[in-house]
Amino acid sequence: MHSVLNGIVFVIEFMTGFLWGDLLKIPLPGGSTLGLSPMVLLLIPAGIYYTLCTKFLPIRMFREMISVLIEKPDAKMQGDLSKGKLSGIQTLIVSTATRVGMGNLVGVVAAISGGGAGAVFWMWITALIGSSTAFIEATLAQLHKRKDPLYGGFRGGPAYYIHDFFFHNKPGEKLEEGIPKKRSIVAALFALSGLICWAGISQVIGNSVSSAFENAFSVKPLISSILLVLIAAVIVLRKNATARVLDVIVPVMAGLYFAMTVFVILTHLPALPHVFERIFSEAFGLRQIVSGGFAAVLMNGVKRGLFSNEAGSGSAPCAAAAADTDHPVKMGLFQAIGVFIDTIILCSCTAFIMLLTPEGMIKDLQGMDILQMAMNYHFGAFGKIFIAVILWLFSFSTFLGILFYARSNVSYLFGDNWASQTAYKIFALVMLFVGGLAQYTVVWDLGDVGIGLMTIFNLLVMYPLSKEALSSLREFEEKRKKLNG
């Protein structure tokens, strides 16, 4: 048995290294090399391709994104969370819950620590091209969604548009269909990869929360883990409670964090030009190229952007498909601006808090300690408590969001039944509890493997299906032109 477990661990570590390690190394001036992982080699070209296909949609249609965000939907499209019906803004909140997590805090700190201030610029660029990928996959999820007999409303995501691709189903053709009797192997592999990934993330979330509360309030991990699981269980084991809770806490937590950052910026306005000068000069600086540091600057920013906004991984489309909307493109625009909110706004909040802190105070620190010291500098003892609470909210909302994603994939694999839905929720709660007591690296690696495989299966089908989303985009723009005269 021991040798079998060792073999499984070896396979997981090998796959993690292959998917996220350096597959291609490009020599650079200064003796350094630019290492490119398979994930970067897949996601960056995909983002550039879809940005060109949509004629630079993130820039060209930014006004349209804001418009769909603030417009009041028709009475039929407003959503009824008690019946499982979500409006466009509610699906954006669910997807934002999973995008906005520990990565917006510690991940950004790690990017700047490893690549300097210039990493922030490349994080922004990655978000811009990632918005186009997010638009395509969310629009496809709407085009191929199904009615959900369990929760009410709709369900869908990559498992369903992958299924339709291999069974040659047209958009909307199977709207009334339940779970098909014949499954697509690729779609099933995507769904399974997602469930593996989200279970692994649950364990990491538990560890993050217990560590933060132990540091801030001296609460023992066992106590914080029990409380976290009990609160989560009350929500996730109730029908349609997840979206209702996220509808409340996500705007609050994001608003609080943004407000704190605005306060930091306003109290350090004279230093702001220097921060921007650092970001742009270190992104393109000759010193970085000559010293061999350009690769670190570029890749830390790119990876941070990719990991944070999830564009291309196929996660967010599981929420986008649940929306009741009068046009599929609107959900694509919602998810495109979701990438903007996550990376350009919230990841930048962490970057500014860190870059407006004297370098000498955080020079020898790592990870969460850097951010806690930065917050302590700006807000005193309150800053440490605030970060612990915000991390709890970010992590907890991520857990609720991934369980929302999981339900459509569980249904695809195991059919429409409450037994499989409840079993996966209990499994995720167990992982959450175990993670609060100890972090097992192999489980985190398993999550990395899961999201890597999700991305491969998703992008594999997105390329041939993207013409459907682009056709829908053209039809949407023509309709808008006629309405606007």
Functional labels for PLM-detected ranges:
Residues 1-102, 112-119, 461-485:
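N-terminal alpha-helical transmembrane segments of multi-pass membrane transport
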Residues 32-68, 113-153, 341-347, 448-461:
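Extracellular loop-to-transmembrane helix junctions
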Residues 42, 46, 50-66, 186, ...:
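Membrane-interface loop-to-helix entry segments
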Residues 50-51, 96, 126-154, 163-235, ...:
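Helix-loop-helix module between adjacent transmembrane segments
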Residues 53-58, 104-108, 197-210, 232-245, ...:
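Transmembrane helix-loop junctions in multi-pass membrane proteins
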Residues 57-86, 107-110, 116-120, 134-180, ...:
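Flexible loop linkers connecting adjacent transmembrane helices
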Residues 77-113, 140-143, 150-166, 170, ...:
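Alpha-helical membrane segments and immediately flanking helix-loop junctions
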Residues 137-149, 262-278, 286, 292, ...:
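Extracellular/periplasmic helix-exit of transmembrane alpha-helices
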